[in-house]
A protein has these predicted regions:
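Short, well-structured N-terminal submotif of metal-dependent ribonuclease cores
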Residues: 1-40, 53-66
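A generic structural signal for short hydrophobic patches within well-formed alpha-helices
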Residues: 10, 45, 82, 123-124
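Acidic catalytic patch
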Residues: 16, 71-92
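Short active-site oxyanion
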Residues: 34-38, 71-73, 112-114
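Beta-rich strand-turn-strand
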Residues: 96-98
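Acidic, PIN/NYN-like endoribonuclease modules and their adjacent C-terminal/linker elements
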Residues: 105, 109-134
Length: 134
């Protein structure tokens, strides 16, 4: 089964100080054990790198790049995903709903991905399921 991995989950896995770190690390481990097809977008990678570099420095970016990214497929946001995401963000008219989230939703729908590993309520609001079946 394919599982989308959001920036919020990536940050929680990477940062031992994150309030969701223990849950994120356990979930990530279970997803790997179950050989889930983990997918993120190039936009989420960019967002994660920017946040990790700012908060923790380049050694943490290296760790992300060498240790975490190799087990996650990167799906590239296409022009139609970007356009759909921008339209959804502007239509929603909610400051806290980002272009990265909206393009992720568009890509997930295009690829038929129903499950998301996240700590962001917007994925639930959009009807996506938790990363692991109950």
């Amino acid at each position: 089964v394919s599982v989308f991995v959001d920036t919020s989950a990536l940050l929680a896995v990477l940062s031992a100080d994150d309030t969701e770190h223990a849950k994120a690390a356990a979930t990530f481990g279970r997803l790997l054990e179950r050989s889930a097809a983990l997918v993120t977008t190039n936009y989420c990678v960019l967002e994660t790198v920017a946040l990790v570099q700012h908060r923790f420095g380049l050694p943490a970016v290296r760790s992300f790049h060498h240790d975490l990214l190799p087990v996650i497929d990167i799906a590239w946001i296409e022009a139609e995903d970007h356009a759909a995401g921008m339209m959804a963000m502007l239509t929603a008219n909610r400051r806290e709903l980002s272009l990265v989230d909206c393009t992720s939703f568009a890509l997930m729908r295009r690829l038929g991905i129903r499950r998301a590993f996240h700590f962001d309520r917007h994925f639930r609001e959009q009807g996506f399921q938790p990363p692991l079946a109950s």
